[in-house]
């Protein structure tokens, strides 16, 4: 995960302009801070479990398997151990750009080269989510009900704030930055749903992979739609020489093919049936309902409707 940070920071500053250099520096500094927070959390976890492997950490929770707030697990029954897990989650929050760890996203999206930002919005996020799933579902699943609520809260905040702030953006790249925050929230709904479903009733094995499966499907759908949108934005931006949404007026007349590609990508990002993101959202929100997270599913649907406003405005 860290090996992706340094080259992406260099690529973000590749254009050597003021905004590009600022984007690269912000990405590097925020990446370093998140790495330090994660390492401190890992140190605390190692200190209380005596293991650096996910299997060893998971084994320390087996006898007996209780939650932090219920007590009873020697390795996980201390406040310091809980802090370690929270710090680990905070570090991942920076990597996947969730609220309230998203402050770097709009500036980096606006200042970095568009092809680099397209890669960053997909590859970096996918890698971070893949590792998050591996770490928390393999190493901390026996105490998952302790962090599932935090995942749900992060998902709700990211969906609401990401979509609401995106409405007021005039720069299309900043708009996509806030949009990526909202999409991170949708993905976290699947993470929280997978945990809640399995933790709520162990007699429902069919729910075990619903959350992770929905996350992986949505990541693939989001990657395809987002890369397509950035391809169109790059081509249109080179022709009109501007990233302002108001300057996109008349693009359908001057470049009908590019406008059509962008329109299809935006329809997919909204989740218009029968696009892949619609299927992904249906998968995620169904998992949330099955996991008794109905409020989160409703919030996700409302947030999707809000996102349609600023996507259609483009």
Regions found by a protein language model. Name each.
Residues 1-314:
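Alpha-helical transmembrane segments of multi-pass membrane proteins predominantly involved
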